[in-house]
Swiss-Prot record:
Organism name: Photobacterium profundum (strain SS9)
Subcellular location: Cytoplasm
Highest taxon of source: Bacteria
Comp. bias intervals (Basic and acidic residues): 285-295
SMART domains in the record: PCRF
Region feature Disordered, mapped onto this chain: 285-311
Name of this chain's protein: Peptide chain release factor 1
Lineage, highest ranks first: Bacteria, Pseudomonadati, Pseudomonadota, Gammaproteobacteria, Vibrionales
UniProt keyword terms in alphabetical order: Cytoplasm, Methylation, Protein biosynthesis
A single GO cellular-component term on record: cytoplasm
Principal place of residence: cytoplasm
InterPro entries tied to this protein: PCRF (IPR005139), Pep_chain_release_fac_I (IPR000352), Pep_chain_release_fac_I_sf (IPR045853), Prokaryotic/Mito_RF (IPR050057), RF-1 (IPR004373)
Post-translational modification: Methylated by PrmC. Methylation increases the termination efficiency of RF1.
Matching NCBIfam families: prfA, PRK00591.1
């Protein structure tokens, strides 16, 4: 392991031990905000500290085994050589774990998120597929014990959605779902196709972290255009006799957010403002990422809607992720929410990308 990485690990362990001492200080215990902040930092450092201590222990075991391998007794030497082999394998495993733990954590990873799905090319079939994607994410959220709530929906006449946005609440929701952003393509025979021809349709997905209330960027009310209108169901049918639905336009960016899910105008406005804050923050992040992308390659793409990330081929029962050339012949399971076999390899590829960038810096 490089000396620069060892120094960094030693510094983190020192900080962990310092916080451990501070958490026993009556002055800190009496200050809830400080105690909460330090407890969170302590928790974040716990895994890497324990892993580094295990690594140092494995290094000591290797040293002792190598010394034992010099023994005159052949039986003792053979046993020591086996221990040397095991210790070296353990050290390599722990080094890999430490490198992953050292990857800078995205501060948004633990947050709730908004998932926005829009039908693209393909007419009615694209709208139906947008509905299928929402169902897939809903099933996946259920498996993870997350809560999913529709914020706004514009239903397609043939089923599914022209566009919709949902909030996913649960531990680590954004960190798991963020790589779903991009273009999703479907290849299948539509129910209305009498000749049995395969059609190609597309949807786009955008995943945005929820911005905590304390961190919501200050939005000048003069920059907002707020319209009210009546909530409508599928096919434009009015389902509410009051103008409870809200449309907010952020004039400087042109971002438009609608919410008509609640009967209360006040609740719809609060939800719309929450989505607007997430979109503005996301737009600022994308601008920063575009600048960073010019300095280093991003293996997983930008997460922009224009990036086609995945194809769902129904006749062949396969789903392919184009960012990591992964193909799985288990489309039915994926569409039922069994998505970890798709999501985890992408997260691992991202980690490998981050490790490569860290190696260049060191």
């Amino acid at each position: 392991m490089k000396s620069s990485i060892l120094v960094k690990l030693e510094t983190l362990v020192e900080r962990y031990e310092e916080i451990q001492h501070l958490l026993g200080d009556p002055g800190i215990i009496g200050d809830q905000n400080k105690f909460r902040a330090l407890s969170k930092e302590y928790s974040q450092l716990e895994d890497i500290t324990q892993c580094f201590q295990a690594y140092l222990g494995a290094k000591d075991d290797l040293e002792a085994a190598e010394e034992m391998a010099k023994d005159d007794d052949p039986e003792m030497r053979e046993m020591a050589q086996e221990e040397v082999k095991e210790s070296k394998a353990n050290i390599l495993r722990l080094e890999d774990e430490l490198q992953v733990l050292l990857i800078p954590k995205d501060p948004n990873d633990d947050r709730n998120c908004f998932v926005e799905i829009r039908a693209g090319a393909g007419g009615d079939e694209a709208g139906i597929f947008a509905g299928d994607l929402f169902r897939m994410y809903s099933r996946y959220a259920e498996r993870r014990g997350w809560r999913i709530e529709v914020i706004n929906e514009n239903r397609s006449e043939q089923g599914g959605y022209k566009e919709m946005i949902a909030k996913v609440s649960g531990d680590g929701a954004y960190g798991v779902l963020k790589f779903e952003s991009g273009g999703h393509r479907v290849q299948r025979v539509p129910a209305t196709e009498s000749q049995g021809r395969v059609h190609t349709s597309a949807c786009t997905v955008a995943v945005m972290p929820e911005v905590p209330e304390a961190e919501i960027p200050e939005i000048n009310t003069g920059d907002l255009k707020i319209d009210t209108f009546r909530s409508s169901g599928a096919g434009g049918q009015h389902v509410n006799t009051t103008d409870s639905a809200i449309r907010i336009t952020h004039l400087p960016t042109g971002i438009v957010v609608e919410c008509q899910d609640e009967r209360s105008q006040h609740k719809n406005k609060a939800k719309a403002m929450s989505v607007l804050a997430a979109r503005i923050t996301k737009a600022e992040e994308e601008k920063r990422h575009a600048e960073e992308a010019s300095t280093r390659r991003n293996l997983l793409g930008s997460g922009d809607r224009s990036d086609r990330i995945r194809t769902y081929n129904y006749p062949q029962g396969r789903v392919s992720d184009h960012r990591i050339t992964l193909t799985l012949y288990r489309l039915n399971e994926v569409m039922e929410g069994d998505m970890d076999s798709l999501i985890q390899p992408v997260i691992q590829e991202h980690q490998a990308d981050e490790l490569a960038a860290m190696a260049e810096q060191n």
